[in-house]
């Protein structure tokens, strides 16, 4: 702009200062005004922290009562929405810089999750207040639990942006949360007690299975989880090997704690079959997804992604030593086949180890079903960058992405690919990793054939994401006994939801 609202900082501040002046004119000089603005905008030529500090001084002089320091602009979706890649409190530095320059209170925001961390940055003088948004969607009783000293009961936001953004605001529908079924669905607040307590078998201790067990037990059913592996968690356990997904541990810790506190019977290293399950009133089948094995020559030379993403840490709580298997060995130049989390997470994890990665997908678009903000940051990192405002470990060798392409033949040291124009290409690779998945419904089909009362939940029903699996489990647990649904208008016996009442005791 070249008018009085553009160019110099004073001109660019004119609009907001005139708004502040008019508010005070209408509401009185003592009417408190808070201004929220970004510490840095994270685009070429955009505002940096030095100018942000000067703006803070101008706003204080204009009579503003408090400053709330955010991050980013619309064209910088990473720092604006801060998905899983961004560490807790990453934006606190901006509030700290502003606080040193003004005497009015300063608030910080962006990926603040734990009360202990919030107390720490306030005590260190980096901020006066903390601002929470997504965390209060994941657990609206965050402050109550913190005040009561029940921080271990807080359902910590994992920054996935699936429920609150991709499947709500982005498509202009009511708010949802990937890890809290009660958000936007009041049926889950005060749960309708079971009309008849049922013996419920839940096959699979992943997201869907654990959430189903939690809700069903709260309603009064007797649940048993059958898990073939040596620990609960399912696909969540791969968070150990994929650094950007480390926040998944927060949800896994919370849901496993709920299962333990509720007294759900858990049978680890146990494979369920029709004979074992006949004694139960109902079966919820959450057996997850299985790796797609393309029928091409040499496929036996490939390895599955779940055999690569195996934790090697000693005494890892998610991968007990008893029964822990060794990860598959991979070479330096690796082809990863697939286009959902199994493939993209594997590609990122091994690229961070310095491997040269080629990601091959039959789709015409990269990762079409992955949450868009994560996808944008992932693409920046795959291209050899580190994402806007991100610090730490970048991918040193860019990940190649081949669209509209499938496997044709695998040989020792090379792979032949074929694209949608039937053009073939042979490339040198040391290892092929299969990362495409599909529902593993074999047990479900056998239970249906045997005439058992069964529901299919999670990835064994349809491969989706955390919210898809969690919602499946919660919904199934709500209708176990003759499809009873709660009437949100007649459950007013307590202001706290059923699970929060238990947690706060």
PLM features: residue spans?
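Rossmann-like dinucleotide/flavin-binding elements
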Residues: 197-225, 267-275, 279, 286-296, ...
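Flanking helices and flexible, charged tails adjoining ferredoxin-like Fe-S electron-transfer domains
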Residues: 186-195, 218, 222, 230-231, ...
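Local beta-strand N-terminus motif with an aromatic residue
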Residues: 64, 127, 280-281, 429-430
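N-terminal Rossmann-like dinucleotide/flavin-binding domain of flavoprotein oxidoreductases
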Residues: 234-280, 370-403, 413
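Short phosphate-binding/catalytic loops that engage adenosine nucleotides
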Residues: 28, 64, 103, 221, ...
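General small-molecule cofactor/ligand-binding pocket signal
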Residues: 107, 224, 265-269, 303, ...
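Flavin-dependent oxidoreductase catalytic cores
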Residues: 1-203, 207, 211-218, 223, ...
């Amino acid at each position: 702009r070249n008018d009085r609202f553009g160019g110099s900082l004073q001109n660019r501040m004119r609009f907001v200062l005139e708004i502040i002046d008019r508010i005070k004119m209408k509401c009185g000089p003592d009417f408190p005004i808070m201004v929220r603005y970004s510490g840095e905008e994270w685009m070429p030529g955009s505002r940096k922290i030095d100018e942000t500090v000067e703006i803070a001084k101008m706003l204080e002089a204009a009579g503003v009562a408090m400053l709330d320091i955010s991050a980013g602009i619309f064209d910088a979706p990473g720092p604006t929405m801060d998905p899983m890649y961004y560490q807790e409190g990453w934006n606190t530095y901006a509030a700290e810089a502003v606080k040193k320059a003004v005497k009015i209170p300063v608030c910080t925001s962006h990926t603040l999750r734990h009360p202990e961390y919030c107390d720490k940055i306030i005590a260190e003088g980096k901020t006066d207040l903390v601002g929470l948004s997504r965390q209060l969607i994941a657990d609206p009783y965050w402050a109550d639990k913190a005040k009561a000293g029940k921080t271990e009961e807080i359902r910590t936001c994992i920054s996935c942006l699936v429920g609150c953004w991709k499947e709500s605001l982005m498509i202009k529908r009511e708010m949802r949360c990937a890890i809290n079924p009660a958000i936007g669905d009041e049926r889950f607040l005060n749960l309708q007690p079971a009309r008849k307590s049922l013996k419920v078998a839940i096959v699979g201790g992943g997201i869907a299975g654990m959430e189903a067990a939690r809700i069903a037990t709260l309603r009064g059913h007797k649940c048993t989880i059958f898990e073939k592996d040596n620990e609960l968690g399912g696909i969540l356990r791969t968070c150990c090997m994929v650094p950007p997904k480390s926040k998944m541990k927060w949800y896994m810790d919370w849901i496993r704690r709920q299962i333990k506190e509720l007294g759900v019977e858990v049978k680890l290293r146990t494979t369920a079959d029709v004979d074992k399950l006949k004694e139960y009133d109902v079966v919820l089948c959450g057996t997850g997804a299985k790796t797609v094995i393309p029928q091409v020559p040499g496929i036996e030379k490939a390895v599955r992604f779940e055999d690569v993403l195996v934790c090697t840490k000693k005494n890892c709580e998610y991968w007990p030593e008893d029964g822990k298997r060794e990860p598959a060995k991979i070479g330096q130049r690796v082809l990863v086949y697939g286009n959902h989390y199994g493939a993209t997470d594997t590609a990122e994890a091994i690229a961070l180890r310095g491997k040269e990665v080629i990601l091959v997908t039959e789709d015409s678009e990269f990762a079409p079903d992955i949450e868009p903000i994560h996808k944008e940051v992932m693409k920046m990192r795959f291209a050899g960058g580190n994402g806007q405002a991100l610090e730490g470990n970048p991918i040193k060798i860019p990940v190649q992405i081949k669209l509209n392409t499938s496997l044709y033949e695998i040989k020792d040291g090379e792979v032949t690919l074929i694209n949608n124009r039937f053009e073939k290409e042979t490339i040198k690779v040391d290892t092929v990793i299969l990362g495409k998945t599909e529902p593993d419904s074999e047990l479900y089909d056998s239970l249906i054939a045997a005439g058992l009362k069964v529901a299919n939940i999670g990835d064994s029903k349809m491969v989706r994401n955390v919210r898809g699996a969690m919602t499946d489990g919660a919904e199934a647990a709500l209708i176990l006994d003759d499809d009873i649904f709660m009437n949100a208008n007649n459950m007013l016996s307590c202001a706290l939801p059923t699970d929060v009442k238990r947690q706060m005791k």
